[in-house]
Amino acid sequence: MTSEKQLILYNDADHNYDYVRACLIKYCKHDFLQAEQCIVIAHNRGNCAIKQGDIMDMIPIQEELEKKGLLTKLISMN
């Protein structure tokens, strides 16, 4: 069993682009363009993989995003 996970961001109607972009930049360490692309994908498809890595690295990021009210889920990469 692998500990590699993807952190998925789900689209919602409660948060605007600026708010989500700021969260992705702060907690996922995205640059402006990467955050913007993730937001557009999540908006158009309903979700977007915003980060991947070891579960122990992903859990704190997920917790911070959820504290900010964003909908996320960790999924296995296989």
Residue ranges and their predicted role:
Residues 1-78:
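Terminal domain-initiation and capping elements
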